[in-house]
């Protein structure tokens, strides 16, 4: 909404906003800040490091069906938002944020992965492992290439199916 108002786009759809962005005098600094704010918003939903602490605890304490739905489907909306909204609208800012995004993704993979290995509860291990796998998705987005984004989409599909079934398996094992 703010981007639509900022560039004075005639309609509220992404092609009009993108065309208005191309014709506007949006500075690189403003685009960098806007992309950063979008990255923070979507990163909180996906549980990007350092905004990751809520996710694993939430999955662990939620009923199994809620954990399956959130980890398998809803978490992917944040990645989809970065791939379909933030990066196409602000491609230069996406390239500028790329190194930091890959470092944050590496933090997701290494730090959360170590916490996942240390878990003694099966559902907790799956929860932290799910958060860790989002780091691989962010690495693919951070590469800023067709191959990186394609591999991210493939991992999103595979993760959605596998983590949902792992939560279901954890529920069966617990009972």
Predicted feature residues:
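Hydrophobic transmembrane alpha-helices and their helix-loop junctions in integral membrane proteins
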Residues: 1-175
């Amino acid at each position: 909404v703010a981007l639509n108002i900022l560039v004075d786009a005639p309609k509220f759809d992404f092609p009009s906003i993108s065309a208005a962005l191309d014709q506007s005098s949006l500075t690189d600094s403003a685009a960098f800040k806007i992309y950063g704010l979008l990255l923070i918003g979507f990163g909180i939903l996906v549980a990007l490091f350092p905004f990751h602490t809520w996710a694993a605890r939430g999955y662990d304490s939620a009923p199994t069906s809620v954990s399956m739905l959130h980890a398998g489907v809803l978490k992917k909306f944040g990645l989809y938002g970065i791939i379909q909204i933030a990066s196409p609208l602000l491609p230069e800012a996406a390239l500028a944020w790329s190194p930091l995004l890959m470092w944050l993704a590496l933090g997701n993979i290494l730090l959360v992965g170590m916490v996942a290995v240390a878990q003694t509860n099966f559902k907790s291990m799956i929860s932290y492992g799910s958060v860790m796998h989002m780091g691989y998705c962010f690495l693919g987005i951070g590469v800023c290439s067709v191959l990186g984004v394609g591999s991210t989409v493939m991992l999103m599909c595979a993760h959605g199916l596998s983590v949902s079934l792992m939560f279901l398996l954890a529920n069966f094992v617990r009972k």
